[in-house]
Amino acid sequence: MDPPAGAARRLLCPALLLLLLPPPPLLLLPPPPASVRLVAATEPPGGPPGQGAERILAVPVRTDAQGRLVSHVVSLETAGAGVRARRAALDQTSGLPGGAAQDPGGRLFYNLTVFGRDLHLRLRPNARLVAPGATVEWQGETGDTRVEPLLGSCLYVGDVADLPKASSVALSNCDGLAGLIRMEEEEFFIEPLEKGQTDQEAEQGRVHVVYRRPPTPKPPPVSEPQALDTGVSQGNLDSLSRALGVLEERINSSRRRVRRHATDDDYNIEVLLGVDDSVVQFHGKEHVQKYLLTLMNIVNEIYHDESLGAHINVVLVRIILLSHAKSMSLIEIGNPSQSLENVCRWAYLQQKPDTDHDEYHDHAIFLTRQDFGPSGMQGYAPVTGMCHPVRSCTLNHEDGFSSAFVVAHETGHVLGMEHDGQGNRCGDEVRLGSIMAPLVQAAFHRFHWSRCSQQELSRYLHSYDCLRDDPFAHDWPALPQLPGLHYSMNEQCRFDFGLGYMMCTAFRTFDPCKQLWCSHPDNPYFCKTKKGPPLDGTMCAPGKHCFKGHCIWLTPDILKRDGNWGAWTPFGSCSRTCGTGVKFRTRQCDNPHPANGGRTCSGLAYDFQLCNPQDCPNSLADFREEQCQQWDLYFEHGDVQHHWLPHEHRDAKERCHLYCESKETGEVVSMKRMVHDGTRCSYKDAFSLCVRGDCRKVGCDGVIGSRKQEDKCGVCGGDNTHCKVVKGTFTRSPRKQDYIKMFEIPAGARHLLIQEADTTSHHLSVKNLETGKFILNEENHLDPNSRSFIAMGVEWEYRNEDERETLQTIGPLHGTITVLVIPEGDTRISLTYKYMIHEDSLNVDDNNVLEDDAVRHEWALKKWSPCSKPCGGGSQFTKYGCRRRLDSKMVHRAFCSALAKPKAIRRACNPQECSQPVWVTGEWEPCTQSCGRTGMQVRSVRCIQPLHNNTTRSVHTKHCNDHRPESRRACNRELCPGRWRAGSWSQCSVTCGNGTQERPVLCRTADDNFGVCREERPETARICRLAPCPRNGSDPSKKSYVVQWLSRPDPDSPIQKISSKDQCQGDKSMFCRMEVLSRYCSIPSYNKLCCKSCNPPRNLSNTEDGGVEPPPGKHNDIDVFMPTLPGPTVATQVQPSPGPPLEAPLNVSSTNATEDHPETNAVDVPYKIHGVDEEVPSPNLIPRRPSLYVKTRNQRIQELINAVQRKEKPGKF
């Protein structure tokens, strides 16, 4: 079926035919019938998360249940050894640094700050996503296959603290954090900025990208809904089952699973996930498995949404990653139906014959990045195909994590769900983000299953018996510690080289455990090896097994042993006596030590705490500066001693290594060592500290990992309400060539800015008032170059551009400074300054104190938001507005833009129960037309819910349970009054003798539409008389015909003659007007049929225009288009026979009434059409095109006339 034109050509979900061609001979599968139809595509759900979304960088940290920092390591792999660490992650309960053991239930906790919001994530393992015994299979180009256990131990679900019922989280921590965080009004994507950097997490944490998706745009309205979704009928399923034959019987019988059934409320979709090479190449072989697990974790979370109304788990039992060649053979570019057919057949061939096999799947999901359909097509699937051996499959275009909605949508089709708004009444839920919308508009913060999806699922779900078994209820055998215990050397040879290969036995001089040598029985002396030993545990001799390349007796002490942490040591001494230091404790992985390939301990081997946070007596001391000064006498650079000053490296990763700057040369030199533990990481952050070469985030509250910060004037967690802005301008005139004192800046000043008002040749100078040392431009040591430098424990930025100087620092100043000017000439000097300071530290003239917008205004409670529900228990939040402190007047919120907005307070509201909404209808509006065929009446139909305060409100129509009253109806559907319109008379039907003429007569309205005419209809046919025809002979091959009616009495009803009591209503047939038939008036049935012609009231020659009056009664234009003979009173039979001559050719008139005619008492008998030979000369007949109106209601007569006309040559009849 071609897609509809216009906007619908975007392929919302076109119904396309799946034409299953015969398979290749090796498949041994009969093709399903061509009538099987599949549901097609869905539009993309907005592209990858980054498109159209806000994004920030964030560094999540791992915490305990109370939100206290445990480690910067967030990846499960980081502390372990690859796959082995992942496999054992859930068993490890004491591997967390900081003494915070992992929750016994395997729960994890993370802190994350996104867009100004602090989130505390509480996660639990998603233990029901990957089935026990599940595998991942890599298929190579040469046909070789590598199978590995599928491990899902790094998949988690959970919620956000403080929003347990209004949030959901689905993350993986295989390699950083990746997945979704969904809250009431927002949703976030998170993924590592760069993959494969888990080894760097322990140093300074792992940088992640967090996307915030904007609201999904409202779709354009569709003028007419189109039912584009058509599923497979039951007949098609039956025919497909018959086509599968014996194979089908075997599969159907095998559905009686013997595993323990799940509870009646639980359904498990065991999934085979097929992935083609385009997906593998895009994500990379080393990352694709983690990505697939994260994607399916999100799909599983979508099916856990309570709006679905059912408990459905999506369980992975097998992943197959296809080779490039196989991927190209399955997907046909631009042909979605053939591509889906190929995928479904491929999935069928992957099915395990034993239903008890742990890889037996109920449903196949295939992911590709190839364009299998038109642009924009994202998915393709059958409807109601679940549990079917061939049709339980979907084809999906993979395009990032948002493809989870495409997978959920297409699997919904297989479960029996239709598109919302197409064939159901849920089109109004499309814009709300319903999963089954024709264009997928669901977003991670606003998705739901519509009420129609819930109803359609409940209609079919109980019939899907394959979803009843529980894959987690097996008593699965424990995996052997040594894999070779289950595979002999012969089996390993077959794996390596193919069927028939066995261990080489031609030579017995080598140790079989050194290298695996294989040969084929056809050539036993030709041995091959892949230069690798057999698997550990492979039997090599009676009672002996291969281990580490040796054939030995296996004893418990040589088997693999995993390591475990020992006890913590006591905390050591503090690294500093004041100014906040750190102290450590350690532990060893010796309880027991890992051995024989066992996994090492996960987590950090040390833990630390802050100590001695009190300020040092010397407030001007700079711990980093002291460390540089210690090397003045010991560290020579360029064979010269230097005075070393502190330097902050531009690279954040190097800031916990000691770099110093030469006071003499300005060179920056690495001291080849780390700074002491407890040194501030940066002069821009007064609290974060270096610990063993790593910068550890510390909040202003002294808590490790805390995000709490100071406001602009140093109040921890403050809102700038106690900040004052001080500014001023000082102007001096040089009177001598000596320092000119301008002003002083007090200790505690922050965000200091000093600059020249005009361009001058003077030099700015700054001196520490307490020590008397210059920190910028001494008189005998001027440096006019722009630069950054560290002095008095803070970083300064000095700029000299076009002889206009500027000096600024974030601060805070630990002591008072004096600002001076070194004059050059006698030009007046003007300096301006501006800084912020806490109001309690203010000791300046009030004239210099200013209050900016951030100080003069504050956020204030404005009102409570409307309750989210009018009944049944809703919630409302505080709404804040910007208020001016001076007069408490509410102003525009822009004045408070620099202030942190308080968090909204939530409270419950409207707890009373809701009443059932009912349908309320309005009055019918006047009809749109007074007559015709388009008249309509409309009225309003609303779903109204009575409220507790004797008011009502309009609610969504889905809340009203009863049948919705009609809102439109037809009215005044009758023909409009018209007038008869007659056309011109046609040419006489003969050239001599008596013939007929016709003309069209139509009843039309003023606007030329069909109408109803109440006046008598003008005649449409009349007799024309021309000169008598000559009686000479004619061509015997030419024949004319006359119709002869033969009737016999009806034995059940006596013949009734026409009497005066039976008033003649006019002729009932067009043949009555032909004079040659007048001889049949003696027959009662014919006399009654042609009562007017057989009993003329006056001479026809005296009739006006020589015509015959039409029968009385009203005739409308509908008669013209539906001409017919009177009722079925005559049967016909063609039989040529001689008869009386015809004076006019047989012609069907168009004046046929539509009124019902009373039946006669005559029983139909065949009548005959007799040939009239050599009586009418051929030039007498005028050939003409049969009228469009030549029809009869008597089907037998019409068929007879048509048959005669076909037999004769054109122009003869």
Curated annotation (Swiss-Prot):
Disulfide bonds join C344-C393, C387-C466, C426-C452, C493-C518, C504-C527, C513-C546, C540-C551, C574-C611, C578-C616, C589-C601, C988-C1024, C992-C1029, C1003-C1013. CDD domains: ZnMc_ADAMTS_like (cd04273). SUPFAM superfamilies: Metalloproteases ('zincins'), catalytic domain (SSF55486), TSP-1 type 1 repeat (SSF82895). Glycans are attached at N111, N252, N949, N950, N994, N1032, N1099, N1147, N1152. Gene3D superfamilies: 2.60.120.830, 3.40.1620.60, Collagenase (Catalytic Domain) (3.40.390.10), Thrombospondin type-1 (TSP1) repeat (2.20.100.10). Its main location: secreted. Binds 1 zinc ion per subunit. Its EC number is 3.4.24.14. It comes from the Eukaryota. Its cofactor is Zn(2+). Residues 29-260 form a propeptide. The active site is at E410. It is an enzyme of class 3 (hydrolase). Keywords: Collagen degradation, Disulfide bond, Extracellular matrix, Glycoprotein, Hydrolase, Metal-binding, Metalloprotease, Protease, Repeat, Secreted, Signal, Zinc, Zymogen. GO terms for cellular component: extracellular matrix; extracellular region. Residues 723-851 are annotated as: Spacer. It catalyses: Cleaves the N-propeptide of collagen chain alpha1(I) at Pro-|-Gln and of alpha1(II) and alpha2(I) at Ala-|-Gln. Residues 561-617, 855-913, 915-975, 976-1030 form the TSP type-1 domain. Residues 211-232 are annotated as: Disordered. Residues 1-28 form the signal peptide. One of its GO terms (biological process) is collagen fibril organization. The spacer domain and the TSP type-1 domains are important for a tight interaction with the extracellular matrix. May belong to a multimeric complex. Binds specifically to collagen type XIV. Cleaves the propeptides of type I and II collagen prior to fibril assembly. Does not act on type III collagen. Cleaves lysyl oxidase LOX at a site downstream of its propeptide cleavage site to produce a short LOX form with reduced collagen-binding activity. This is A disintegrin and metalloproteinase with thrombospondin motifs 2. The lineage of its organism: Eukaryota, Metazoa, Chordata, Craniata, Vertebrata. The gene is Adamts2.
